[in-house]
Swiss-Prot record:
Domains (record comment): Possesses an unusual extended V-shaped dimeric structure with each monomer consisting of three distinct domains arranged along a curved 'spinal' alpha-helix. The N-terminal catalytic domain specifically recognizes the glutamate moiety of the substrate. The second domain is the NADPH-binding domain, and the third C-terminal domain is responsible for dimerization.
InterPro entries: 4pyrrol_synth_GluRdtase, 4pyrrol_synth_GluRdtase_dimer, 4pyrrol_synth_GluRdtase_N, GluRdtase_CS, GluRdtase_dimer_dom_sf, GluRdtase_N_sf, NAD(P)-bd_dom_sf, Shikm_DH/Glu-tRNA_Rdtase
Residues annotated as binding NADP(+): 189-194
Site, as annotated: Important for activity: 99
Biological source species: Staphylococcus carnosus (strain TM300)
Pathway assigned to this chain's UniProt record: Porphyrin-containing compound metabolism; protoporphyrin-IX biosynthesis; 5-aminolevulinate from L-glutamyl-tRNA(Glu): step 1/2
UniProt: substrate binding residues: 49-52, 109, 114-116, 120
Key word NADP present: yes
Pfam families: GlutR_dimer (PF00745), GlutR_N (PF05201), Shikimate_DH (PF01488)
Subunit (UniProt): Homodimer.
UniProt protein name: Glutamyl-tRNA reductase
Something else known: During catalysis, the active site Cys acts as a nucleophile attacking the alpha-carbonyl group of tRNA-bound glutamate with the formation of a thioester intermediate between enzyme and glutamate, and the concomitant release of tRNA(Glu). The thioester intermediate is finally reduced by direct hydride transfer from NADPH, to form the product GSA.
E.C. numbers: 1.2.1.70
Similarity remark: Belongs to the glutamyl-tRNA reductase family.
Amino acid sequence: MHIIAISINHRTADVALREKVAFKADAIRESHLDLFETKSILENVILSTCNRTEVYAVADQIHTGRYYIQRFLARKFGLEVDEIKEMSEVFVGDEAVEHIFRVTAGLDSIVLGETQILGQMRDAFFIAQEEGTTGTIFNHLFKQAITFAKRAHHETDIADNAVSVSYAAVELAKKVFGNLKSKHAVIVGAGEMSELSLLNLLGAGIDNITVVNRTKERAQQLAEKHQTQYADLSNLNELLVNADIVISSTSAQNYVITQEMMNNVLDQRRHEPMVLIDIAVPRDIDPAIELDMNVFSYDIDDLKGLVDANLRERQAAADQIAEQIPAEINEHNDWVNMLGVVPVIRALREKAMHIQQDTMDSIDRKLPDLSERERKVISKHTKSIINQMLKDPIKQAKELSNDKNSSEKLELFQNIFDIEAESEYKKSLAKKERKLSARHILGFE
């Protein structure tokens, strides 16, 4: 059995293409089942976010599995197979396992180390589990990847440092005030950067936010969208007097907050702490403003310097996480290799126990007058003999898990001891047949 991952992401396709191959939320469950019905696919998980569409599968053959996944995607989105090939990356075997770990840990995201993808991957796995399209391999692998990502984020704090200008603005305010929940924030502007700043302020727990814009209707639209307040730009002076945090991002060609305005504001504030953050180009806040010791002012260069430093820290944390992935892959492979050995050992033990039980039945027939104590002693000793006889064969079988020719040698092992173990492949195939049979009986063609 082979693990395959096919990824359409921000590196391989622009946003217009990614939109074409995004699964609708109300169709994702049915899509799992549609792929599961496909020839060669034994297990599958589908991940679909705004930045990536990925299919993970356990297939009986690499080439057929890859083709049927690509064909599935092409048919699902009305494209040609060649179009899917052009916009996707394909990972097989250890590379596919590594890719799953990297994606889950946020190492493959546009925003390096972001944590949202972990929840999205977990949800994708849970949906696949609920629909019955995962089995022994993926149930183990995805749990391992999710656990690894959680641990990696906790140990490295990779997501703690701001790597966007709007988020960095809020982080700077936190450094001044600590907890922001009781603070009043004013956002000057109603564009994309202003909305991102608003979202980050809300995320920091601030609910007293006023959006100010030259066009009052745009301020109203943004404020109502996020259930905050709004005001006309003519009220800015009054708002600044009571504001703790001001984030300005307009397209104005002249200063929106002038020295004269701030002189008046500072006189009324009585030296209360205040943070001014200017993320506009050209600048909205006059750099000539004479600030007192309790007013902290930052512009776009200050923020970019912080973002750049944080990006370096994130990259160092990402490198640290990436260094741990090979060990996780080895752990996964060791577990997979043992999958082939465990049924063989189980079959050997079962055969030995049958022999022991047959022996005890024969003794009972030939020596019917044995006391219960005598029977228990004989049973104990026959089991002991069998366990001693099995010790070396079982040890040899376990060592085969690390042998590159383990399949052939395990088959020889079974022939020598005249046993037959059910392989993981046969179990997966049987599970798939049962699932599809039940689905067809219920009328889901």
